[in-house]
Amino acid sequence: MIISASTDYRHAAKRRLPPFLFHYADGGAYAEHTLRRNVEDLAGIALRQRVLKDMSHLSLETELFGEPLAMPVALAPVGLAGMYARRGEVQAARAAASKGIPFTLSTVSVCPIAEVASAIERPLWFQLYVLRDRGFMKHVLERAKAAGVKTLVFTVDMPVPGARYRDAHSGMSGKHGGLRRMLQAVTHPSWAWDVGLHGRPHDLGNVSDYRGQPTELEDYIAWLGNNFDPSISWKDLEWIREFWDGPMIIKGILDPEDARDAVRFGADGIVVSNHGGRQLDGVPSTARALPAIADAVKGDLAILADSGVRNGLDVVRMIAMGADTILLGRAYIYALATAGEAGVAHLLELFEKEMRVAMTLTGARSIAELGSDSLVTGSAAASIERTLSPSL
């Protein structure tokens, strides 16, 4: 199969992966309306084409929290990434480091913090959930510090798990899930040999390290389900600050007032995100939410964004609407599942080339030159209202 776009990696991953893993990454909450609108709304943003601007000295380089980035992109935290390729978090982190961008390790990764941090030379980012077990939270924060992690991504949009119907249909959860997953693995021998057999252990490295015993997939579902904390509030941010003095990003902001609260409570950055449409179906797409949030807090903290980004053009659109850096989730997981580290590195090369084309044809020589003037109407908020279908 010829891979020329990130969508090609999705098709390749679907063939290689057992259904329970493919749909775990690919699916969303409820009827998946928000999942689809993330992509559709972003693709509907119109950019101004500018010509004869001498674009021979174009640069994608930027900086975030004093850390140089080769382009305004980072790999997002994705749970169980180590199930998509052998020691998948390590492979993805190496690919990101080789391309000069950050990798964010999930709390519920297969590979533990120390293993991933020791595999790369640039600082690792780490993502943390608020869980009932505060002892675990303190434990992983201490491990993150010891491993040289500089930036913490604090996920706040999971006080309860989303209703993901695909997981029940595919065997990730639900009745006879273990048997269904085993049968799927047998019928996908390439994955079974590379990851199922040689990618062991398949436990949650950070959780197992804390509990002192292996945490298999069934344990993961039960442990995480019992540890989500609906009592989460801004006071938890203060508690975490007692243990973390580095840059802290709040992930899961969709409303300008929440963004203002993040500023008031001392966050260094936010991620405008609906969790890739995996939590609450029916909330606005990130493309719809971003302009108003940027108007509210731009310049007060760093604005990151995710959800719906499928190519370098989408990155340019998000930056023009007010984001500083974009997180990639599903896009890199498909590439990781297809070709491991090499696949993720190639995906990032595709994104870089697509960004260069888009910036050349919009007349933006640097990331700083991308802004509301890059949009057709000259206003991010007006542009999105005019370019998207009224039915959405």
From Swiss-Prot:
Paired cysteines (S-S): none
Binding site for FMN: 106, 127, 155, 251, 306-330
Topology of this chain in the membrane: Peripheral membrane protein
FMN hydroxy acid dehydrogenase domain span: 1-380
Catalytic reactions of this protein: (S)-lactate + A = pyruvate + AH2
Cellular component per GO, a single term: plasma membrane
Active site per UniProt: 275
Subcellular location: Cell inner membrane
InterPro entries (alphabetical): Aldolase_TIM, Alpha-hydoxy_acid_DH_FMN, FMN-dep_DH, FMN_HAD, FMN_hydac_DH_AS, LldD
Family: Belongs to the FMN-dependent alpha-hydroxy acid dehydrogenase family.
Record's protein name: L-lactate dehydrogenase
Organism ancestry: Bacteria, Pseudomonadati, Pseudomonadota, Gammaproteobacteria, Oceanospirillales
